[in-house]
Amino acid sequence: MLGWFGIFGRSQEIQRLERALRAHGHHPALVMDAVKITTVKQLKAAAGGQTPDQNAIESAATLLAYCAMGREDFAENNGWSATAAVEDRIVAAFERGGTIDEKLVLLALTARMVHPSVRERFDLKAE
């Protein structure tokens, strides 16, 4: 995932995720490598073991950026319609259960990277 002992650099999937995070206004250095690696592994599992496509990477980055930045900062960088869309995704993820969105939000929560306003808004707790 991170290249062979770092000699060859980061994997293309990780690089794509980092670019997508940056495009949403969240610096990728603020996301732990373990979260990025696990995100890519979750996306691969959801794609039946195949390399995740760009849409899946973008979708995951949107969710992670929102969780980390909080509603206001995310909206400032991405607009209110994108903010409403990601909030709808979070609600739907926990209503359905077992979705990739739910897994990614729980990953962010476990990694302690969820903004306090997001934790409060969706009543998210890590136990």
Predicted regions and their residues:
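Amphipathic alpha-helical binding modules
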Residues: 79-127
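Hydrophobic membrane-targeting and insertion signals
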Residues: 1-5
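Short terminal alpha-helical segments
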Residues: 6-53
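Charged, low-complexity interaction regions
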Residues: 26-33, 46-55, 71-80, 94-104
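Amphipathic alpha-helical segments in structured regions that serve as interaction surfaces
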Residues: 18, 34-44, 55-65, 82-86, ...
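Compositionally biased, low-structure terminal segments
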Residues: 6-9, 75, 123
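Amphipathic alpha-helical interaction segments
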Residues: 12-13, 74, 88
